[in-house]
Amino acid sequence: MSLHTFFVAPTGFGVGLTSTSLGLIRALERTGLKVHFLKPIAQPHPGDDGPERSSELISRTLGLSPPPAMPLAQVEHQLAMGELDEVLEEIVSRYQQAADGADVVVVEGMVPTRQSNYAAQI
C-alpha cells in the first residue's frame, strides 16, 4: 500500500482542529491502517509553557510518538531572515520521520492569525 497524507486545515481559531485530527486518526485505525501524526509547527496558546498541545494529546490518547513540532519562535525568526527554504526542508524532514512505517500520516496545519499571516505560505 502506498503512503497517504491527510492535511487537516482549520477554518478559524478554536474550531476543534486537534479533536478533528484525533477522530480522523481513530477512524482510520479502526479500518486497520497504521496512522501517524505530525504537527509541523507549534502554535502555542497564550501562556502555554511546555510541550506542544496537539502532539501531546495525540501521544497521550493514542500512544503515538509524533516528531516534535518546530518551535514557533524559531520558525518566525527563520522566516524573518528569509530562510523559508530551510523551514520547508525541516518540515519535510519531520514529515519523513512521521511517515516511517505508516500507511497514513495526518498532518495538522496552523490556524492563520493576524500575527501568523505567513501560515498560508508554509
Predicted regions span which residues?
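Loop/turn-to-beta-strand initiation segments
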Residues: 101-107
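Conserved catalytic-core segment of NTP-binding enzymes
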Residues: 110-122
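N-terminal phosphate/diphosphate-binding loop that engages ATP/GTP or pyrophosphate donors
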Residues: 3-11, 15-101
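Conserved beta-strand segments of the P-loop GTPase G domain that flank and frequently precede/overlap
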Residues: 9, 107-109
